[in-house]
C-alpha cells in the first residue's frame, strides 16, 4: 500500500528526530539503483527508524515509487507479542499489554519480509508446541529456573507447565532465541523441520525480489550487537548475495554517541554504490561494515577510559588522522581542533553518569579499526 509506506516513512522521520540528533554523512540525494542490496550495521533496535527516513528522503521515495526498497527483517517481528519482549526495561503491566499486539500481518504491506533461521527458534515457539507439557519436558533446567525466578519476582505462582508462562510477564524470555540443543520438546523434529521449511521459503522470496529488480535492505549481523563488536555476520549472507546476484551494494553504517548532553547523537554514513564481492563474501561485507562505521568522540573517549587512561585532545586528533588515512567517515563535530576540544570536554563531563555505555563504545571503536 503506497499510502501506508509514506505514513511509516514520515512517522520514522518524526520519531528519529525527536529521539536523537541525527547527522548524515555522504550524499543527501541519490537514486536507488535496481537490484541494490543495502547492507547496514546493526547497533540498536532503533536502527530502522533512524536509517529509514534517510533513505526515504534521500532517494525521494514518495516520488520514485518504483525505487522503494524492501526490508529483510528477523522473523520474530512477525510473532504476536514481539514488542513485549523488545527491551528489558519494560514494566510487567506494559509487557502484558503489548503481548496481545501482533503487527506481523501488516508488515508485508510496507515491504517488510521475514528472514528466519533453521537453527534457532524462540522460547515461545518451543513452548507453544506442547502448551500442556511440563516446563522441564520442553526447556533446559537453566531456562526453567529463570522462568521460575521471574515468577517469584513478579509475585506469580510458580509455573509448572508451558501454558503457565505463555503470558506477557515472561515476554523477554519468551522472545529469546534458542538452539536445538537447548530444548527438549517431544515434538522437536516437527518444530525444526517447520523452521527449516519456513527459512528456505523466506530465503527464496528475498532472492527473487532482488533478481526482479527490487532493492533490499539487510542487516548482515542479524541482531543488534550486544557488546559493540561489529560482526559476526549471520549464516546465509554469502548465499543471499550469490543467489540474489545484486547489481550493486550500498553500505550504511550507524554510530550512536551517548556521551553528549541531551539527546544521543547519531552519525549515519551513506556510502558509495559498489559491485558486490565475488569472493570471500562474508569477509568482504564485514570489512565494508567496519570501515564505513563513523568515528565519534564518544568512541575515542570510552576506549581511553576503559583502558585506564585519561583522554586528551591529542588522542582525538590522532584518531581523526588515522580515520582520514583509512577513509573512515568522521563525525563533523571532530573536524577541527575547536570542535574536538568541545567534544572532549562534553564527553568527559557526561562519562561518569553513562559509564555503563563505555565498554560498548570502546569495543565498537576497536572493532571498526580492525577493518
Task: For each feature predicted by the language model, list its residue ranges.
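Residues that form or flank phosphate/diphosphate-binding pockets in enzymes
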Residues: 33, 46-49, 228
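Membrane-interfacial amphipathic helices and adjacent loop/beta segments
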Residues: 1-27, 42, 46-207, 265
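A short beta-turn/loop motif at secondary-structure boundaries
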Residues: 27-31, 258-261
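Pre-Walker A (Motif I) flank of P-loop NTPase domains
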Residues: 32-42, 214, 221
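A general structural motif
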Residues: 33-35, 66-68, 213-215, 246
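Short, hydrophobic/aromatic-rich beta-strand segments within well-structured domains
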Residues: 37-39, 70-72, 217, 250-253
Amino acid at each position: 500500500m503506497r499510502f501506508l509506506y509514506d505514513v511509516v516513512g514520515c512517522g520514522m522521520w518524526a520519531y528519529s528526530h525527536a529521539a536523537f540528533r541525527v547527522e548524515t554523512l555522504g550524499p543527501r540525494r541519490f537514486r536507488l539503483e535496481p537490484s541494490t542490496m543495502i547492507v547496514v550495521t546493526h547497533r540498536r533496535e532503533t536502527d530502522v527508524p533512524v536509517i529509514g527516513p534517510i533513505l526515504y528522503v534521500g532517494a525521494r521515495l514518495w516520488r520514485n515509487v518504483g525505487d522503494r526498497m524492501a526490508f529483510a527483517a528477523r522473523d520474530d517481528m512477525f510473532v504476536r507479542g514481539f514488542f513485549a519482549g523488545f527491551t528489558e526495561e519494560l514494566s510487567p503491566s506494559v509487557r502484558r499489554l503489548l503481548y496481545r499486539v501482533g503487527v506481523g500481518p501488516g508488515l508485508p504491506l510496507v515491504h517488510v519480509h521475514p528472514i528466519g533461521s533453521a537453527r534457532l527458534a524462540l522460547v515461545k515457539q518451543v513452548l507453544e508446541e506442547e502448551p500442556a507439557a511440563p516446563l522441564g519436558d520442553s526447556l533446559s533446567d537453566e531456562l526453567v529456573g529463570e522462568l521460575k525466578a521471574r515468577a517469584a519476582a513478579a509475585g506469580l505462582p510458580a509455573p509448572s507447565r508451558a501454558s503457565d508462562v505463555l503470558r506477557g510477564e515472561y515476554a523477554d524470555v519468551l522472545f529469546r532465541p534458542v538452539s536445538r540443543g537447548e530444548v527438549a520438546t517431544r515434538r522437536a523434529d516437527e518444530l525444526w523441520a517447520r523452521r527449516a521449511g519456513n527459512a528456505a521459503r523466506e530465503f527464496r522470496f528475498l532472492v527473487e525480489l532482488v533478481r526482479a529488480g527490487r532493492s533490499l535492505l539487510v542487516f548482515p549481523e542479524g541482531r543488534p550487537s550486544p557488546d559493540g563488536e561489529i560482526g559476526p555476520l549471520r549464516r546465509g549472507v554469502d548465499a543471499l548475495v550469490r543467489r540474489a546476484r545484486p547489481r550493486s551494494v550500498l553500505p550504511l553504517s550507524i554510530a550512536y554517541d551517548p556521551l553528549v548532553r541531551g539527546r544521543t547523537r547519531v552519525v549515519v554514513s551513506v556510502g558509495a554504490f559498489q559491485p558486490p564481492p565475488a569472493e570471500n563474501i562474508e569477509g568482504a561485507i564485514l570489512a565494508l561494515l567496519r570501515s564505513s562505521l563513523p568515528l565519534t568522540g564518544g568512541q575515542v573517549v570510552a576506549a581511553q577510559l576503559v583502558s585506564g587512561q585519561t583522554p586528551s585532545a591529542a588522542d582525538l586528533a590522532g584518531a581523526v588522522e588515522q580515520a582520514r588515512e583509512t577513509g573512515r567517515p568522521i563525525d563533523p563535530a571532530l573536524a577541527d581542533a575547536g570542535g574536538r576540544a568541545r567534544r572532549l570536554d562534553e564527553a568527559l563531563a557526561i562519562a561518569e553518569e553513562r559509564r555503563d555505555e563505555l565498554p560498548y563504545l570502546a569495543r565498537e571503536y576497536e572493532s571498526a579499526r580492525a577493518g
